[in-house]
Curated annotation (Swiss-Prot):
Belongs to the EamA transporter family. The chain crosses the membrane at residues 7-27, 34-54, 69-89, 97-117, 121-141. Its main location: membrane. PANTHER family: ACYL-MALONYL CONDENSING ENZYME-RELATED, SOLUTE CARRIER FAMILY 35 MEMBER G2-RELATED. Keywords: Cell membrane, Membrane, Transmembrane, Transmembrane helix, Transport. It comes from Sinorhizobium sp. Gene3D superfamilies: 1.10.3730.20. Residues 14-140 form the EamA domain. This is Uncharacterized transporter in cobO 3'region. InterPro entries: EamA_dom. Pfam families: EamA (PF00892). GO terms for cellular component: plasma membrane.
Length: 141
């Protein structure tokens, strides 16, 4: 298995693109919140099978409290994001919803600097600006 973060990030992007297309079709005839529930159940089953099959299960009692807290917060943010995303897909075109959703990249860059102490150079900030501009051009015009 590849240990390259770039490989996994590109794979994530490819699956995220498929997610937008599949989700747009999937929410066409049902409530977007219920569609999110179905998606979540599928993800839970698949990830549980992967963790079990690869022997990656960990004892919950051995996981530090801080880890539980931040994973719970991440889960809540993910759920809110998915609910909003599916509602947006129900109401709008996938080709316009997905780029606007990807403004999360811009927000992550800002939050990373503000809260995680990460550093971005001038070229990085230029890239962030281009992503923001591109997302807005795709979604608004």
């Amino acid at each position: 298995m590849s240990q390259s973060w770039q490989f996994w990030a590109l794979l994530s992007a490819a699956f995220a693109a498929l997610t937008a297309v599949f989700a747009k079709v999937g929410v066409a005839q049902i409530n977007s919140d219920f569609a999110t529930l179905i998606r979540t159940v599928v993800i839970l089953c698949v990830i549980a099978a992967i963790v079990a099959a690869t022997g990656q299960w960990q004892k919950p009692s051995e996981i530090p409290g801080r880890t539980w807290l931040f994973l719970a917060l991440s889960g809540l943010a993910t759920g809110a994001s998915w609910l909003a995303y599916f509602r947006a897909l129900k109401l709008g075109d996938a080709a316009r919803v997905a780029p606007l959703d990807k403004l999360s990249i811009v927000m992550v860059a800002i939050f990373g600097v503000l809260f995680l102490g990460e550093k971005l150079n001038l070229m990085n900030w230029l890239g962030v600006a281009f992503i923001a501009a591109g997302a807005l051009l795709l979604a608004v015009f």
